[in-house]
Amino acid sequence: MNYAQSGVDIFKEEKAIKGLLSSIKTQRKGIGKPLGGHYAGMVEFGKFALVLCTDGVGSKVKIATDLKKWDTVGIDCIAMNVNDALCVGAEPIAFVDYLAIDNPKSEITKEIGKGLEKGAKISNISIIGGETASLPEVINGFDLAGTCLAYVEKDKIITGEKIKPGDIIIGLNSSGIHSNGYTLARKVIEISGFSFKDKFPEGNYPGKKIGEVLLTPTKIYVKEILELLKKVKVHGLAHITGGGLRNLPRLNNNVKFLINDGFEPQQIFKFLQKFGNIEDKEMYQTFNMGMGFAIIVSKENKDKSLKILKKYSDSEVKVVGEIKKGKGVEQKKLGLKYSG
């Protein structure tokens, strides 16, 4: 099985996005002038760039509803946005959420709010507003998304253009699937004969239901990345989300990202691959496969960066690869290559 067969075609999505962008031409001048970006968009604001990014939790919310456990999807909503904002070297400061729901119930919204609050606290941001829309004729269940505001001094923007052969790729491990690939994950559970309420098989995740493992919140990398940026000149930052390793060339398509010592994927990935009969290449271009965030620094800054990240992060931190001449991404152990 692959992601497209489960209902999500990432290549079709890319074409659709290009179609949308082809219709958008208006650009402001002066304050608010677009400054580009990759994971997040930037606009002119004096000596600063204001940074905006929008993302959602996706179909992970369907599992939350199935288990009637809504208290962590708010963390995911915050995480998906603040982690993207970090990728241009920006510090997240504020957030607005968007909740579309078929039948607003306080017992659901209160739990969603708990997760949003926890995510905001971890990220040190303020939730300053939002929108809750009751859409019974449009939506079945609910959809949760948000927008993050961040800022960065213009001379400290990180675009990835400084990435060069010889640089080192440092990885921070993920907590699991995070918030991407859930349409495929849910399809695997469906065809395998399991349910989200079943205990996880084969002795992994003792006592936990499959759905509980899948609801593990997305890691938030704000603290350790901001501390690193204070002390090290970072060449590139990548949030490993939908598209898996194919996220890396977004930073710089004129070099090759060689992953030669990646993280061991958590058991949830092995479970999905086994019962979904999913090929390695599809797994690594759909899921994060154990690595939630990547940092590219010069070889000279490797040890200093590792020391800082290990001090401030509760994630596993290690060198996962290096930058070579060429293009795209290579996962050396499995012989996987992606053009980006």
Predicted stretch roles:
Residues 18, 40, 76-80, 114, ...:
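Short, contiguous clusters of charged residues that form electrostatic/catalytic patches at enzyme active sites
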Residues 2-5, 108-126, 139-142, 195, ...:
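Glycine-/charge-enriched secondary-structure boundary and capping motifs
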Residues 83-95, 282:
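Short, flexible active-site-proximal loops enriched in glycine and acidic residues
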Residues 27-30, 37-38, 45-49, 68-69, ...:
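Short coil/turn connectors at secondary-structure junctions
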Residues 165-208, 212:
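Acidic, glycine-rich loop-and-beta core segments that form the ion-binding/anion-interacting portion
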Residues 21, 44-49, 57, 76-77, ...:
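Glycine-rich anion-binding loops of enzyme active sites
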Residues 1-86, 124-128, 164, 171, ...:
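N-terminal glycine-rich phosphate/pyrophosphate-binding loops that anchor nucleotide-derived ligands
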Residues 38, 130-134, 152-158, 221-225, ...:
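Glycine-rich, charged/polar anion/phosphate-binding loops
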